[in-house]
């Protein structure tokens, strides 16, 4: 499948590979191994891939036995792999690098040796047990791989043209028109249901069977639960509880994560490491409250107030509708045709969070409450900085609407209070493009262009 990260790999090969290894961080099953091996086949004369989740003891021992003796190391590695490496024209891939930290530590010296290029892939890269006994190399260029974004999904369906036109309309603030807008909304609903996990997308492309798509997604969820049991040492119960309550937390009006849902007497300090583990696994997209809409949102972050979105909305749907009695194909087709009585707001907001993360944004929201002054009660779904920072008006507030009938009371209060700080407010909705009363209204499928 065509992935945008391929261009980043090419840029690294051209400009950085002589001085840095490439580290690709991402959740399990987002396609890290596949895209790296595809890149290796196309762009190098030969390559060796070591999967540390199943590497032999003989391979692992090479890193200890021949550490610092790189001529011997490469000789025995080639003999074990049955692949001839060529200086300046070969790639070595360390897959699931977090499972063998000694290999990651060796990257410093392998890069300095200069004979070959190196790509590492993994998740849980910063968890203490994966880094506690090693010196993390500075010779790493780190990038993220997310689930397939909406445009990549369309490419997989064979549509290479629509997003170019959508992008043009976005730049001109020009509506698509009824027919094309309806087509794009149909595509978006399908993307929301199938999601962006490559296995699920491939299943849809090959079979057009939503039951089989759902089965692929549930297999991924089972894999994530198994990972929690195997690798969240001492945190298994907390991480599992947080993971399983994501749908019910997003179902709430405010969508902020309530620690009380994790059990009586739970305190933030007790679960912070569990939240960190889930974040590092890349299966969730945390969104933190910012106390003011100013440049440097990270400095205004309130870590005690967060929302927790699933990294993939297709997985969220399978997690939320877990009843065995529900036939996936019937459920999904009702969702497709908007004939299911569910909280579409949580699904659409999760979808926008997924789009913004894939576009490179960190996630922030704004929330304010007052018992005495209604004007101080406001919630804004997302805050993102303008592309070009000026002396003021640098933060776009974003509201997400899942239906055609809605009000903008909270957004209006927010804009009025912070009129000297915020840029044009944006509403992502089910309608077409329009600009009205200083508000930019964009269809939901343009969320990834922000």
Mark where each language-model region is.
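Pre-Walker A adenine-sensing motif
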Residues: 1-16
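A cross-kingdom feature that marks ATP-driven nucleic-acid transaction machinery
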Residues: 13-20, 29, 38, 42-45, ...
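Hydrophobic anchor at the beta1->P-loop junction of P-loop NTPases
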Residues: 24
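Conserved lysine of the Walker
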Residues: 32
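Short glycine-rich substrate-engagement loop in P-loop NTPases that contacts/grips substrate
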Residues: 54-88
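Structural recognition of the conserved hydrophobic beta-strand(s) that form the central parallel beta-sheet
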Residues: 93, 117-123, 144, 153
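Short regulatory helix/loop adjacent to the ATP-binding pocket of P-loop NTPases
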Residues: 109, 126-142, 154-159
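Interdomain hinge/linker elements that couple catalytic modules in large macromolecular machines
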Residues: 158-348, 354, 362, 368
């Amino acid at each position: 499948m065509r992935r945008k990260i391929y261009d980043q790999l090419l840029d690294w090969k051209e400009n950085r590979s002589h001085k840095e290894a490439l580290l690709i961080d991402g959740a399990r099953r987002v396609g890290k191994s596949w895209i790296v091996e595809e890149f290796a086949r196309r762009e190098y004369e030969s390559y060796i891939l070591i999967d540390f989740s199943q590497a032999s003891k003989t391979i692992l021992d090479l890193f200890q036995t021949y550490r610092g003796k790189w001529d011997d190391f490469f000789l025995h590695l080639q003999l074990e792999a049955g692949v001839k490496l060529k200086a300046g024209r070969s790639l070595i891939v360390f897959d699931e690098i977090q499972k063998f930290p000694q290999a990651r530590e060796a990257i410093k010296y392998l890069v300095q040796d200069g004979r070959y290029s190196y790509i590492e892939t993994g998740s849980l890269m910063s968890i203490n047990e994966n880094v506690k006994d090693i010196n993390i190399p500075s010779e790493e260029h780190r990038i993220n791989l997310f689930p397939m974004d909406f445009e990549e999904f369309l490419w997989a369906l064979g549509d290479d043209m629509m997003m170019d036109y959508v992008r043009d309309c976005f730049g001109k603030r020009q509506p698509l028109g009824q027919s094309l807008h309806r087509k794009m909304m149909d595509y978006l609903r399908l993307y929301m249901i199938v999601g962006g996990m490559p296995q699920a997308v491939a299943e849809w492309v090959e079979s057009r069977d939503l039951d089989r798509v759902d089965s692929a997604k549930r297999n991924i969820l089972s894999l994530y639960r198994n990972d929690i049991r195997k690798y969240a040492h001492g945190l298994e119960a907390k991480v599992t509880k947080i993971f399983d309550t994501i749908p019910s937390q997003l179902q709430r009006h405010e969508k902020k994560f309530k620690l009380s849902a994790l059990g009586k007497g739970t305190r933030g300090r007790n679960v912070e490491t569990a939240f960190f583990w889930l974040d590092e696994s890349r299966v969730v997209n945390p969104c933190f409250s910012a106390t003011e809409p100013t440049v440097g949102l990270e400095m205004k972050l309130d870590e005690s107030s967060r929302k927790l979105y699933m990294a993939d909305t297709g997985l969220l749907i399978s997690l939320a509708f877990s009843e065995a009695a529900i036939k996936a194909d019937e459920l999904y087709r009702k969702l497709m045709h908007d004939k299911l009585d569910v909280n579409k707001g949580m699904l659409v907001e999760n979808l926008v969070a997924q789009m913004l993360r894939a576009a490179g944004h960190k996630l922030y929201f704004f929330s304010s409450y007052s018992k005495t002054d209604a004007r101080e009660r406001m919630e804004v779904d997302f805050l993102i900085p303008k592309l070009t920072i000026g002396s003021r008006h640098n933060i776009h507030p974003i509201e997400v609407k899942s239906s055609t009938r809605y009000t903008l009371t909270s957004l209006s209060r927010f804009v009025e209070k912070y009129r000297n700080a915020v840029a044009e407010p944006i509403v992502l909705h089910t309608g077409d493009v329009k600009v009205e009363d200083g508000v930019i209204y964009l269809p939901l499928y343009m969320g990834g262009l922000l």
